[in-house]
């Protein structure tokens, strides 16, 4: 797992929400800064432009220096006070060992101001429990950001996700304010196109035809209040059933 240039752009686009107690779902590597042998290479140049375009006053190289190839320094430079990582195994140096197929311990309830999943959820079997864990670990007023596989990643993980999934499970009715929903088309290892997904008319189905390139879905939302919401239906079917 790691932060590539498209993930960096996504994080930079909502940088103001990275603060306080931050949690990574799986420890993230620095994939955007180029190789360790050439930190001034093309990826680093592109990454620096992304940071500059989002009015961020440090460089990709700053996030690498003095670190071990992971993203804790990036998040602290963005504004996090502490950065924890939860993972199934300690093999990559996580601070919390937990199987996300199971509910998290109460000590992690309402514990974090910012949670980032950058490519983990698609590898976990029990997606409902994963989402429930994210919700219960996030403080009211905190922000959840998820970037995961959307299309042309068959075989990468267990799942690929539709934008509709995140829009539904983190809806206003579930206690969240949507801050951003995008699709990232990976046109090469060093380039991407980002497409903002507008809110559809109530109950309308929103389908997307994509190119043969791999695509991520990227979603960010703010938790407004705690609501016990665990049963969701797709909005266009609710419209058909007369329940919207």
Question: Where on the chain are the PLM-derived regions?
Answer:
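Residue-level detector of flexible, active-site-proximal loop/helix-junction positions
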Residues: 29, 90-92, 102, 183-188
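Aromatic- and Gly/Pro-rich amphipathic surface segment
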Residues: 31-85
């Amino acid at each position: 797992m790691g932060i590539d240039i498209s993930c960096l752009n996504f994080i930079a686009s909502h940088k103001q929400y990275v603060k306080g107690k931050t949690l990574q779902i799986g420890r993230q590597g620095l994939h955007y800064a180029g190789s360790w042998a050439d930190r001034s290479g093309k990826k680093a140049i592109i990454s620096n432009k992304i940071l500059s375009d989002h009015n961020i006053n440090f460089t990709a190289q700053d996030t690498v220096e003095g670190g071990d190839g992971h993203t804790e320094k990036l998040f602290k430079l963005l504004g996090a006070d502490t950065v924890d990582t939860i993972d199934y195994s300690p093999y990559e140096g996580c601070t919390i060992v937990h199987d996300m197929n199971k509910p998290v311990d109460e000590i992690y309830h309402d514990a974090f101001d910012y949670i980032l999943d950058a490519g983990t959820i698609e590898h976990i079997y029990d997606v409902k429990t994963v989402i429930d864990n994210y919700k219960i670990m996030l403080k009211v007023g905190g922000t959840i950001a998820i970037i995961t596989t959307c299309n042309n990643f068959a075989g990468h993980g267990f799942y690929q996700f539709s934008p509709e999934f995140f829009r539904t499970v983190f809806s206003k009715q579930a206690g969240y304010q949507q801050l951003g929903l995008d699709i990232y088309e990976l046109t090469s290892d060093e380039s991407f196109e980002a497409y903002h997904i507008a809110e559809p008319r109530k109950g309308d189905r929103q389908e997307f035809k994509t190119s043969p390139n791999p695509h991520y879905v990227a979603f960010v939302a703010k938790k407004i209040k705690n609501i016990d919401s665990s049963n969701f239906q797709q909005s266009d079917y609710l419209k058909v059933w007369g329940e919207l």
